[in-house]
Amino acid sequence: MDVTTDAGAPWLVAGLGNPGPEYASNRHNVGFMVADLLAERIGARFKRHGKAQAQVVEGRIGPPGPANRRVILAKPMSFMNVSGGPVTALRDFYKVPVGNIVAVHDELDIDYGVLRLKLGGGDNGHNGLKSITKSLGADYHRVRFGIGRPPGRMPVADFVLRDFSSTERKELDYFVDRAADAVEALVIEGLERAQSAYNS
């Protein structure tokens, strides 16, 4: 599979999460939060896509000229564990190379608010990534947003489906803003520069 990024092709940025107001503030929905902020920056609202089970925003990011990129922001509406279906449908509809796909997701094995950008690799037990990888292979970009490990013996499923704590919420806007910056840097400047700036 060709994983070379194509500057002339559109980028597909999929913020992962679960649909519905009861999940909106969960740790597992931080990908949706980042996608919402990116849409706000573009100045557009998410709309239901006619051919995929997803909400999308189409726009451009970056300065005028060769660094300006066409971007499709997406929030799969299929629930986290089957994110691969909507992402694949959007990939096919917009003819996006796999190397131009970015999944934004929560990551248990990284401290809260810390970012890690990478291309390819395993799913680390993340069911949203597992679903996408099953459909597309592993060679897409990831922006991993650290949420930390659950306290004590709390089951992982309970932890990720709970809202951020009151202490975490004090910094959440800052961290989501930084993650959106990282996505923009990845799309505009490339992975290595974005990693240098945001892999903390």
Swiss-Prot record:
Binding site for tRNA: 23, 79, 81, 127
Enzyme Commission code: 3.1.1.29
Pfam name, any one: Pept_tRNA_hydro
Residues the record marks as site: Stabilizes the basic form of H active site to accept a proton: 106
Top-level lineage group: Bacteria
Subunit annotation: Monomer.
Name this protein carries in UniProt: Peptidyl-tRNA hydrolase
